[in-house]
Amino acid sequence: LVKELMKDRMFYEQSGGGVTLSGGEVMAMSTDYILQIAKALKKEEISLTIDTCGYVSYDKFEAILPYVDTFLYDVKVMDPELHKKYIGVDNKLILDNLVKLSDAGARIYIRIPTIKEVNGNVQNMEDTIHFLKKHGIHPAQVNLLPYHNTGSSKYPKLGMEYKGTDLHAPEKEEMESFVKLFQDAGYTNTKIGG
């Protein structure tokens, strides 16, 4: 994989970009495999970003932390019961890992996939802000990601039922009000999208 990634080195250098590992939960893969990729990219001075939901043992983060430039870290629902209802697991491990990564000095982009019927409300946004402040977490950016159903057409092709038909993105004005909540709380690097 690293040899394949190196073929695009010219694009990384010209754009100032790098490699983002995402899709599924990258951190759930073999730590040795991720570490091998991360070390090789670091050696070649190519930036590495990891997209994660944070639901893995912290020792996996600890192993790759020296080789990762940025973490795109999903924070979906602050209420543990709602998180379990919609995501299937409690959010304690996810939030604990976020605190540990922040304490370790990691560069973090908080990403909040925002669904009107689930977490697209003032209470969840205020709870998120409170958590960040309480733990001294200062993300490089906060991205509020409006819900979309772009991948819904793939489900029937895979013989699966798409269950997100009753879900919607908050209205533009609501999204803008959430951005303002974060900005007013000192997170001036908050934006819609990312």
Where are these regions (language model features)?
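Aromatic/basic-lined ligand-recognition segments
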Residues: 1
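Conserved AdoMet/S-adenosylmethionine-binding subsite of the radical SAM
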Residues: 6-156
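Short glycine/proline- and charge-enriched loop/turn segments
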Residues: 156-165
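Short, flexible active-site recognition loops that position polar ligands and cofactors
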Residues: 164-174
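A cross-taxonomic marker for long C-terminal extensions/tails that follow the last structured domain
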Residues: 172-194
